[in-house]
């Protein structure tokens, strides 16, 4: 969750400093945790350093079960209409803003009016079990280039999906964005996406 929050906060700060209001930023980050036999602490796996590292990771996970953790953070700027009205009286270049993100952040402007920044952070966990992969299957997949930018060195939504024996938990967590979790977070903030049920011709 900390990594997803830092990603969201970086973008939020940049947009707020540029004068944007009434917006939301979504950040996510995924890591894989694998418990080796005889080890007390799990190995935390991010993206592979290179093809050789991807081969090492997939060989380690082959035929085994690991856990996928995806942290999601939403930071939403909720402007105060009265604040906007008072601030608009002054020239834009005279209005400087300062953003300080805390648990429930308060964004203080020079107009002495506060705007709220709603923050939600969640972590979704899914267990994934691989089939036993042969060295050739691992090499062929790594040579495709697909695993080189993915946590755990695989993309379940692509060709590698054929090597997944079982999933226990949210499929979207493994992809890197647990949609059901995100939807609940947006509802808590008061952001309700529209058009989900519109028929596509």
Descriptions of predicted regions:
Residues 1-201:
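Anionic-ligand binding patches
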């Amino acid at each position: 969750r900390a990594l997803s929050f830092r990603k969201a906060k970086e973008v939020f700060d940049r947009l707020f400093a540029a004068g944007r209001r009434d917006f939301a930023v979504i950040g996510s980050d995924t890591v894989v945790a694998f418990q080796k036999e005889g080890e007390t602490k799990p190995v935390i796996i991010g993206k592979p350093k290179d093809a050789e590292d991807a081969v090492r990771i997939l060989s380690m996970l082959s035929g085994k079960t690991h856990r996928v953790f995806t942290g999601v953070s939403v930071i939403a700027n909720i402007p105060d209409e009265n604040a906007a009205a008072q601030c608009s009286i002054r020239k834009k270049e005279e209005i400087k803003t300062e953003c300080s993100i805390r648990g429930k952040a308060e964004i203080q402007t020079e107009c002495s009016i506060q705007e709220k920044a709603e923050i939600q952070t969640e972590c979704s966990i899914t267990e994934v079990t691989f089939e036993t992969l042969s060295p050739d299957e691992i090499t062929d997949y790594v040579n495709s280039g697909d695993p080189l930018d993915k946590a755990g060195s695989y993309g379940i939504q692509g060709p590698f999906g054929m090597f997944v024996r079982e999933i226990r938990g949210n499929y979207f967590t493994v992809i890197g964005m647990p949609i059901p979790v995100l939807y609940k977070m947006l509802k808590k903030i008061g952001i309700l996406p529209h058009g989900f049920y519109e028929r596509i011709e």
